[in-house]
Amino acid sequence: MARGFQGVMLRGLGARDHQATVVDKEYIAPHFVRVRLVSPTLFDEVIVEPTSWLRFWFPDPDGSDTEFQRAYTITESDPETGRFAVDMVLHEPAGPASTWARTVEPGATIAVMSMGSRGFSVPEDPEDRPVGYLLIGDSASTPAINGIIEVVPHDIPIELYLEQHHDDDVLIPLAEHPRLRVHRVSRDDASSLAAALELRDWSNWYCWAGPEAGALKQVRTRLRDEFGFPKREVYAQAYWTEGRAMGSSRGETSTPAKPAAKTAPAKAAAKPAAASGAGTPEHAAAPAAATTGAPQAAPAPGAAQPRTPVRGRWRAEAGSRLLAPLKKPLIVSGVLQALITLIELAPFVLLVELARLLLGGAEAERLWTLGLTAVSLIGLGAVLAAAMTLWLHRVDARFAHELRGRLLTKLSRLPLGWFTRRGSASTKQLVQDDTLALHYLITHAIPDAVAAVVAPVAVLVYLFVADWRVALVLFIPVLVYLVLMSVMTIQSGSKIAQAPRWAERMGGEAGAFLEGQPVIRIFGGAAASRFRRRLDDYIDFLVSWQRPFVGKKTLMDLVTRPATFLWIILVAGVPLVVTGRMDPVNLLPFLLLGTTFGARLLGIGYGLSGIQTGMLAARRIQTVLDEPELVVRDRTGQAGTDHASGDQARPGTVELDRVSFEYRPGVPVIRDVTLTLRPGTVTALVGPSGSGKSTLAALVARFHDVTQGAIRVDGRDIRTLTADELYRRVGFVLQDAQLVHGSVAENIALAEPDAGLERIRTAARDAQIHDRITRMPDGYDSVLGAGSALSGGERQRVTIARAILADTPVLVLDEATAFADPESEYLVQQAINRLTRDRTVLVIAHRLHTITHADQIVVLDDGRIVEVGTHDELLAAGGRYRGLWDSGRYSSPDAGRPVSADAVEVGR
C-alpha cells in the first residue's frame, strides 16, 4: 500500500505499524460507531492517557493502493489483553474512514501507529490546578472531551460548548461530572461557536478546544482578543475541516497533509448535515443530565449578551506582572550585553587579520596597531561587563528589598489556613529559593541568554563573509542534531509529560520512606518492599524511555564536538584551497571560531533555561501576592454583627450563625451551620473523616474567613477583630505540637512574651511538664526546636502550658492524646483537664471515649449538623452517633492507638 510523503516521514521519525484486528463494533448513535480492536504489540509503546489517540491507515474506497491516515481518540483500553476501542463519526458523503467504519466486519485488520499523541492531565498539586475547565468541541471531539471530564476532580467546574452539526448529536453520551454544564450550539456559520461563549470573567480557567477548523479559528481569536486567554492556557487543535472530505490524505498522487495533522487528530469530515431546528436542543440523553439537571443551552449567536467582555487574569501571566517595573532595565541590559558580546568577539576577528598581515609580510607598526586595538577591545569588554553586572546587582538589590518587604507583609496578612495548606517547605521555597532565582534572572539570566544568541549569530555572519561555502557546511552537524532531537521528542510522546510526575511521586515516596525508617525497620517489611517496587517501576520507566535513544544520544554528542567541526572544516576547506578557489588565510576564522560553533548554538538552550526558571519563580511569588488577605472589617454599619445583651455578651460565648464555607467556589465543605457554645462548656465535634470537623474548628480560630454567615465571639463578629484581639479571646492546641527554635521558657511564653518566669513555671506545673523541664540540662533555658529530644506527649504538654499561660476564654482543642506515648497520655489528659477548666472549649474528637462527658456533642456529616445533644441523649436517640458508638471503630485516620483504661475524658 502507498502512503506517500508523510508515510515516509513518519517512518523516518521512528513510527512503526501495529496490526490491529477488529473484534466488534457498536452503534452509539445512528451516525456514531464504536469499533473495538485488539493488537498484540500496540501497548508495548503506547501509554494511554485522556485524549490519547492513534493514527489509522484506511484503504481507499475506490480500490487504489493508496492508504489514508486519520487519527481517532482511544475510548477504551486494556493493555493486558491488547484490546482497545475508538469512536468514529460517520460522515456523509463518506470518506475513507467513514466508509471503512460502515462496512468493516469482525476479523478485518488495519495498520495503526501511535506517533505524536499528546495526553491530557490535571496538575497533581491543587495549587497549580485551574479554577475551571472550558471545553469546546463537537461530535468528532466528544470522545476526547469525555476522557477529560472523567479525570477532572469533582470540585472543579466544567463549561462544555458543543457545536451541533446533526440532529442525532444529542444522542452521543457524555461522561458524568457533578459540576458539568453543557451548552449546545447550532451551527449557522464558522462564527456560531465562538459567538456563543459566555461573556464572563474566565480568569485562571484552562481551555481545551477541538472543534472544526473554521470554528476553531474564530474561537481562538475570541479567547485571545476578548477574554485575554494566554497562549499556554489554551490547547487548540482542529479535529476536522468542513468541506474537505479527506481532511489530510496520503498516497502517490495526493498532496502532503498539513503539519498539524501530525500532532492532533484530524477526523475525516465531509460537511455533515446541519441541524434543522433553529433553537438549541438540550442534551436530554447525556448521563450528566442526571446529576446536574438539564444542561444549560448556550445562547444563540444573535442573542443579547453583555456588550463588554471581561479580560481575565491568569497565574501564567503573574511573573510578567511582578517584573513589570524591571522591564526597561532588563531591556537595557539585553542591548548592552549584545554590544558587549560583539566587542568581545572583535579581538578574534582582529586576530585573523593579524595572521593575514603576518603571512603577507606587513610592517611591524601595523601589527602593533592591530594588536593593541585587540587588547584594548578585550579590556573595554571586561570593563563594560563589570559595570553592567554592578548596575544590575544594584537594580536587583533595590527590587529584592522592596519585594521581600511586600512578601513578608503579605505573609503576615494571609489566613493561617494558607500556611497549613501549603506547609513549611513550600513557604521556605517561596521566601528563600524563589527570591534567589529572581536574583539570577535579573542579574545574570538575561545577559547570559542574549550572549548565547548573539555570539553564534555574529560568528555565523562573519564566517559567511569569510567563505559562504564552508560556512554552509557547518550546518550539517547542527541539522543532524536537530533531526535527532525531533525524532527523540516525537518518539517519547507522553513519556515527556510523565517524567516530572514520576520524579515528584518518587520524591514523596523517598521522603516518606526515610522519615519512617524506625517503624519500617521493625515492622515495615511490606512498606520497604512497596518502596522498592515503586523504585523498580520508576527505573523500568526510565529504561524503557531512554534505552532506544542510546545510539541517537551518542551520535548527538559526537556531531556537536569541536573535533567534528574541525574535520568538517578541513574536509570542506582543504579541497577548495588545493584547487585555488579559496585563499588559505580564509580558513583561519573557521579554525578559530568555527570549531566552537556547535557548542555556541547549544548554549542558547542553557541560556534560555535560566529565564524560564526565573519566570516560574516570579509567577509563584506574584501568585502569593495576589492571594486574598484577612481584612479587619470596620464595625460601623455591620448590621447584626454585635450583640450587647444576654448570654451573647458574656465572655466566652461563641456563636456560629448560618455559617457556610468553600475552599473552591461552588463546593461547600461547611453548609449552613448554626451553633452556640455557651461560656464554660465543652462542645465536641464528631463525624466521619471528611465531615468538616477540623474545618469548622479552624473557622472559629479564623484560619479562613467564612463564605456566608458569621462567627461571633463575645458578641463581636471575628472579622471585626484584629489578630491580637482575636487570639486574646481564642486559643488553640493542635494535634501536631508546634515548637519554635528557642528556649523552653520562650516556647511557653509565645503568647505572653513579657510573662515572668514564675508564671511560666506555674503554667508548666499545670500542664504536667515542669518536672520534665527541670531534668533537662539547662532547665527552662534549654533550647528546643523542630528536632528536640522531647517525646510526642511532652511536646504536647509544652503547647498546653503555652495555652494555659495565654489564658484565653475560648479554646479550640484538636484531641491532643491521639499521638501521645503510653507513658505520658495520662499526664496529657490531666493537663487538658486543667486547661479546659472554666473555659469555652470546642474539641475535635477523634475517639468517642474521650468526650462522653462533654456538655454538647455535635455530629457532622458532609459539612452539616445532623445531631446535637449529650452523650446519653444521642445514644438514646439511636441516630448517627449511636451507630458510630456501636461500631467501636470511630476514629480519624490519624487517631493513633486505642485509649488507655486510665484516660480522663474531656469535660469530666
Swiss-Prot record:
Q: Which residues lie on this side of the membrane: Cytoplasmic?
A: 1-329, 393-444, 491-557, 608-908
Q: Which residue ranges does the record assign to the ABC transmembrane type-1 domain?
A: 331-613
Q: Which residues lie on this side of the membrane: Periplasmic?
A: 351-371, 466-469, 579-586
Q: Which residues does UniProt call coiled coil?
A: none
Q: Name one GO cellular component term.
A: plasma membrane
Q: How does it sit in the membrane?
A: Multi-pass membrane protein
The answer to whether UniProt assigns keyword Transport to this entry is: yes
Named from the GO MF annotations, one term is:
ATP hydrolysis activity
**Ranges for domain FAD-binding FR-type:** 15-124
**Extent of Low complexity compositional bias:** 253-309
Which InterPro entries does this one have? AAA+_ATPase (IPR003593), ABC1_TM_dom (IPR011527), ABC1_TM_sf (IPR036640), ABC_transporter-like_ATP-bd (IPR003439), ABC_transporter-like_CS (IPR017871), FAD-bd_9_SIP (IPR013113), FAD-bd_FR_type (IPR017927), FNR_nucleotide-bd (IPR039261)
Record-linked SMART domains: AAA (SM00382)
Q: Region (Siderophore interaction domain) spans which residues?
A: 16-245
Query: What range does the record give for the signal peptide?
Result: none
Residue ranges spanning the membrane: these are 330-350, 372-392, 445-465, 470-490, 558-578, 587-607
Q: Keyword annotations for this protein? A: ATP-binding, Cell inner membrane, Cell membrane, FAD, Flavoprotein, Membrane, Nucleotide-binding, Translocase, Transmembrane, Transmembrane helix, Transport
Q: Where does ATP bind?
A: G687, P688, S689, G690, S691, G692, K693, S694
Description of activity control: The ATPase activity of IrtAB is stimulated more than 38-fold in the presence of Fe-MBT, and more than 10-fold in the presence of Fe-cMBT.
Could you tell me the EC number(s) of this protein? 7.2.2.-
Q: Which cofactor does it need?
A: FAD
What's the stated role of this polypeptide? Part of the ABC transporter complex IrtAB involved in the import of iron-bound mycobactin (Fe-MBT) and carboxymycobactin (Fe-cMBT). Has a preference for Fe-MBT over Fe-cMBT. Mycobactins are then reduced by the siderophore interaction domain to facilitate iron release in the bacterial cell. Transmembrane domains (TMD) form a pore in the membrane and the ATP-binding domain (NBD) is responsible for energy generation.
**What is its quaternary makeup?**
Forms a heterodimer with IrtB.
Give the protein family. Answer: Belongs to the ABC transporter superfamily. Siderophore-Fe(3+) uptake transporter (SIUT) (TC 3.A.1.21) family.
> Can you quote the domain comment?
In IrtA the ATP-binding domain (NBD) and the transmembrane domain (TMD) are fused. In addition, IrtA contains an N-terminal siderophore interaction domain (SID) that binds FAD. The IrtAB transporter assumes an inward-facing conformation, which may represent the low-affinity state after mycobactin release towards the SID and the cytoplasm.
Which miscellaneous remark does the UniProt record hold?
Answer: The import function of IrtAB is contradictory to structural predictions, which suggest that it has an ABC exporter fold.
Name of the protein this chain belongs to = Mycobactin import ATP-binding/permease protein IrtA
Protein's organism: Mycolicibacterium thermoresistibile (strain ATCC 19527 / DSM 44167 / CIP 105390 / JCM 6362 / NCTC 10409 / 316)
Q: What is the lineage of its organism?
A: Bacteria, Bacillati, Actinomycetota, Actinomycetes, Mycobacteriales
Per the record, the gene is irtA
